[in-house]
Amino acid sequence: MTHVLVAIGSMGDLRPQLALARALRAEGADVLLLGLEDYAPLAADSGVPFRDVGTRLMGPVSPPLLARAARGSQTIGALLVRRWLHDSAGAIARALARAVHPGDHLVTGILGLAACRLLARRRGCRLTELALAPTLPTAFADSLVGAPRAGRSRINAAYSRAVRRGSVTMGLPIARALDRSGAGEPVGAAGRGEGGETGGIIVACSPRLVPRAPDWPTGTRCTGHLVLETPEWRPPPSLLRFLDSGEPPVYVGFGSVPVR
């Protein structure tokens, strides 16, 4: 059995998977990391077997007016990611189909979830979702980023289900490409993020920051942030001066998205 870690997205999506890959290899497990071509050197430096998915990060957004709009709007940014996924879906689907074998263990973030569900069903694989932000459906505000209501609320539950549905849907082009290739079953409930083959969920956030919600799915584990250690890195003098100038700052963020 190989642990196939699927990291579709930015550096914030890749680094936790790379940290997990290194930990698994330290335990003697077979690991294969799938990611964008841009990250092959980082995987090589970490000693992790890597296979690119035949596509690269989005280039600079043009025209400049659209780039400014994307920086200021999560909606526009999401639409640009959706367009990129649509254009890259065929290459990613082919890479997944080649890399995954019966009995493997798939670990994927949200953008690869629909496609990995299809492969898990078709090839008898175990599937674990790696959530890098507290966005699982829940009624409890303390366990949900961007919760519209404090405490427990049905509005929170409805909001989080809608966010979940929209996030999983962004990866549907990859699942559809798999379906057309014959590597997955027809896209139905599994592609919409309902029911299916997820055997467990890892919430890679600190339990001190994100308490476990009572209504999270069974098998959900809050592990803390998966940190890729870089002992050779040294902070630049300007950063050291900043850190020494007062009380230690507190950064709160999930994945590659700063929150506060």
Regions found by a protein language model. Name each.
Residues 1-51:
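N-terminal subdomain of nucleotide-sugar transferases
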Residues 13, 259-260:
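Short, solvent-exposed loop/turn segments at secondary-structure junctions
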Residues 36-41, 45-249, 254-259:
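Nucleotide-sugar-dependent glycosyltransferase catalytic domains
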